[in-house]
């Protein structure tokens, strides 16, 4: 079938290249709730979640917990221990997600965030505002940050945040 010894190698190389190109999703642009245009590859597979774990897990559905590589866990485990226990019982992998600290008590760590190598960071609007001085480090590392907002308590923000989570 292959008369020239390099023909087989060339065909194999082309197959690998085509396969790789099919898997590499081109970046898309999404608009977060602050009106910021954010470019990222979808679906994100290594997510850091700053807040709204119940909302994220409800929208992300099956497999959503496996995509989390870091969270602000301390406040959730302390303020809602019974709910946290139920989540861990149904999705045991959540117990292994690293705690990156809490923005409210200024323990959130950009270093820990960078160390888990996320391809997306999802923050609440208030977290984004509080971390404004530190976020350029994520941008310099090529890590997109998307802002959602359920604290506004408006239908518009809830819908925008939920639709955005569904895209990510």
Which residues fall in each region the model found?
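A short, structured surface patch at a secondary-structure boundary
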Residues: 49-50, 55-115, 120-126
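Second-shell loop/turn segments in exported
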Residues: 38, 44, 56, 99-103, ...
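Bacterial N-terminal signal peptides
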Residues: 9-19
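Extracytoplasmic substrate-binding proteins
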Residues: 27-30, 120, 130-168
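N-terminal secretory signal peptides that target proteins for export/translocation
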Residues: 1-5
